[in-house]
Amino acid sequence: MISLNNSFFNKRVIVNSFNNYKRSFGTKSQNEESAIVDSNHSFAHTLNLPKTTFSMKANAATREPTLLKDPYKLYKWQLENNKGENWVFHDGPPYANGDLHMGHALNKILKDIVNRYKVLKGFKVNYIPGWDCHGLPIEQQAFKKLKKSSDMKASDIRKIAGDFARKEIEKQSKGFQEMGILGDWENPYKTLDYGYEVEQIQTFYDMFNKGYIYRGVKPVHWSPSSRTALADAELEYNNNHTSKSIFVKFNVKSLSNHILNNLPTTSDINKAEMVISAIIWTTTPWTIPANQAICVNSEMDYILVKPIESEQYRNEMFIISKERLESLTKSFNIGELKVILEFKGEQLKGTITKHPQYDRESPIITGDHVIEGSGTGLVHTAPGHGVEDFQICQQQYPDLKVLSPVNDLGCFTDEVGEKFVGLEVLGDGNEAVINDLETIGSLLHKEDYIHKYPYDWRTKKPIIIRTTLQWFVGLKNIQKTALQSIERVNMVPPSGSNRLSSMIGKRTDWCISRQRVWGCPIPVLYNCKTNEPLINDESINHIKELFGKFGSDCWFEMSTQQLLPPSLKDQHENFVKGTDTMDVWFDSGTSWRGVLVERGIIDKDTGRADIYLEGSDQHRGWFQSSLLTSVCVRDIEPYKNVVTHGFLLDESGIKMSKSIGNTIVPSTVIKGGPNKVQNPPYGVDLLRTWVASSDYSKDISIGPNILIKILDGIKKIRNTLRFMLASNFDFDPTIHAIPYEKLSSLDKYALHRVFKLQESVTRHYDQFQFQKVHTEIINFSIEISSFYFDVIKRHLYAESPNSHSRRSTQTVLFKMLDVINIALAPITVHTSEDVFLHQYQFKNNGKGLDKNLIENSVFAHGWDQLPSQYENELISNQFTNIIAIRDVVNRVLQSMRSQGIIGRSDETIMELTVTNEESSPFYDNLFAINSQLDDIFCVSNVLLKKFNTFEKDVEQQQQQQQQQQQQQPQQIEPNSKGEFIFNTIISNNSKQLGRIEVLLKISDKFKCPRCWRHTSIENDKVCKPCDSVLNSLK
């Protein structure tokens, strides 16, 4: 039984369409070795042989540059000529450092696909490419050029860094334009632009005025390798970092009353001689000198234990978590630990311990952040080097002077004493602390500990927590508004919403000050006596005016007197300018204002970009910083849609890395490598097709084998396009087009399929589902080629040039080509431009279009919406059934070919016997197109019959045939008359439509020497239809 649905083919037909794909383009095969495309045929001059200069091969490396419309000129043209609404695509700025890599290509091509689609739909696309210009990597380039670090002036570093960034921008810009990226390349934005920095410091001041920005002493992520504070977004985590973990004894100086009063007196416990210690565990031994407390959980159970098998510790007892007893007994490896006393953490309050290395106390305090499962249950607390440590100490000891004895270089200061001063805390200093603890008898145990640890994302080196005076954005008061705003944003994929919300919900402060030279300065001067910041309307307006004229370099080049507002210039000796610069995420995070508002693209109070599209790492980067600054200033999110893509993997699923050597650069894919055999030049369209065909919501693989597969897909589509162009070589739609109502049922069916293609492709583009767009077009090309193209060849080639049926088919092909090419255009930019020029060759009296004119671009043509009348479900259902029958016929013909009975299908004639199920118009639908059945089934003649019953039990025969088909390829044997007969049932959506019997036999007529159909009455004579055409040509 053949079961159908409303798709173009059932599954078997789709599979067959792949096998028969080449046949639809005139490629020689057993069934299609047709003289119709043989120019040496004696009747060739009477045939409408296909012709086109559209090459089978793309020759992309050489031809694409000649086809590409200038991305900037096209961008300007659409802004001036498109009549639709504004579409604001805000570009997340890549770093102005280094050559373009495949991540750049993935990101920019995805953006360009969106923008070019919107241009075709008539929108005015606003897309201003941008670059992130500040930060350490560019500053390091300046260091390399300045020979002596002692001679480095801030102004010298900044000049070299700025020049370097501008050169990198110029290089990257050229590469992006070669990829066909549409945009305002003459006026990109740069975070070092004067106007941009003016808007940035205004945003800083607005947030300060609203109370969101403040200055304070807090623990921050500090990078000794970069010598600056870092934000969360500037960290990456090493899951296999190895730390030295230690268990340290803090001797109890005085116990809490509860424990003291309940301490038992036994023969093995001498209170006078017994030493009680609180045992802490840490993976950062270098922070022990900064310890100022020990934290426990008031609700957890703790125990006092005594080693009873260790001579070394016979006069000692340890305080540890009850839950950790078994694990710690193994770790300490000093024998059994006897439980002496059990108590709650709350009962430890009031206990005072002595710092093992310094003459100071460390009280035991309580905190909810202490949990079971690791360590000892007693947490070493160094408020100068831990966020939670700092918070708990601030709550319980507001006046505590926090110790943070580490300098900008990550070395101990003299606060720790002579034995450690100057040592690197992540190196020799760490070892020195451990050795010292061991020497004084306070080290109970040490071991390596592998865990997740934060690294500087730029230098790839570990960071530390360090308490310093910094500028922060306090997030507690805006978290609710920020989280509510995320709910209004369309996230693609939807999981991005939870991810962004989770990150913002867990964040309390954002450190925005950096101790670097190359960046936008924090526009604040400080009172020399009070250290109070000078920041008010007058000071900010004055600095804005200076930045607007001279750029932020003036902050480092001008005197304090020049930087002070007029009213305070006489007091310049009382002020000093700050040396901090802003976090690069604050730089780029204010781009909604520095670009979109400043250039008048969106309203300053309520305007939002239509879309932000970046890698998934930007949930903790640009997406977040943009949201926070916009919500702080305007109480509104800066974007309507946020689309994220994954990262790049090689063909083995391994992340691409220069150190591994598995990277591929865009230029190699486009232009080829030194060895063109090993790395051939594929061109830009292939790179863009790779992007479009990938599920960008996940990590994406690329490699030689993947590129070859992409190339095969491009060839299929290109052949489809070429067939339509070649078939319409003499078609001018302004003269030859046939009205819809006069088209054949077959042509109407083809238009219905084109309509549905356009409908689905439009939907997928609107939802940013480019992989589905690509799949739809590929499948349509294969499906339409294996059926419609197969059926229409006789009309195209053998009928008279101006016959109704030929012009009807060409009308459909023109519309079909238009829709497919326009649907492809956002992806295969160059190919679509080429097709467009060939399709409209009839323009200007056959001279075609001037390819040098922007208005002759396919993107100026627009996304023509097909008329709704093209959607014809009635005809679609009819042809769905017919195609299923054709599948049956093809299987019978294949049996005849495999047995050597025929070479071509049109050597046969066919009898198609049909029975109708009750209330089914199955036979009537076939009868309505009776005249087209021989073309549809590719045979010389079809005789349609109608009967009520068959002689055989069809259902029983169908079951036998299905069983045979499961075991081996179906082979149909002829009967005694040489006839091939096959019976089956046709059904649609489980509804039985009718039964058919297909009878195929050799035609008793002769082969027509012109069309090769076996319909001639006499040998070597043309058939009647061909004779009529020949007479019309005289």
UniProtKB/Swiss-Prot annotation:
Q: Which family does it belong to?
A: Belongs to the class-I aminoacyl-tRNA synthetase family.
The residues the record assigns to binding ATP are K658
Give the EC number: 6.1.1.5
Where does the transit peptide start and end? 1-32
Give the keywords, sorted.
Aminoacyl-tRNA synthetase, ATP-binding, Ligase, Mitochondrion, Nucleotide-binding, Protein biosynthesis, Transit peptide
InterPro entries linked to this entry: aa-tRNA-synth_I_CS, aa-tRNA-synth_Ia, Anticodon_Ile_BEm, Ile-tRNA-ligase, Ile-tRNA-ligase_type1, Ile-tRNA_ligase, M/V/L/I-tRNA-synth_anticd-bd, Rossmann-like_a/b/a_fold
Find motif ('HIGH' region) and give its ranges.
94-104
- Note whether Cell membrane occurs among the keywords: no
| An annotated Gene Ontology molecular function | aminoacyl-tRNA deacylase activity
Q: Name one GO cellular component term.
A: mitochondrion
- Tell me where in or outside the cell this protein is found: Mitochondrion matrix
Q: Provide a GO biological process annotation.
A: isoleucyl-tRNA aminoacylation
Q: What is its main location?
A: mitochondrion
Motif: 'KMSKS' region; annotated at 655-659
Could you tell me the superkingdom of the organism this chain comes from? Eukaryota
Q: Which organism is it from?
A: Dictyostelium discoideum (Social amoeba)
Name of this protein: Probable isoleucine--tRNA ligase, mitochondrial
Reaction catalysis annotation: tRNA(Ile) + L-isoleucine + ATP = L-isoleucyl-tRNA(Ile) + AMP + diphosphate
Q: Which residues form a coiled coil?
A: none
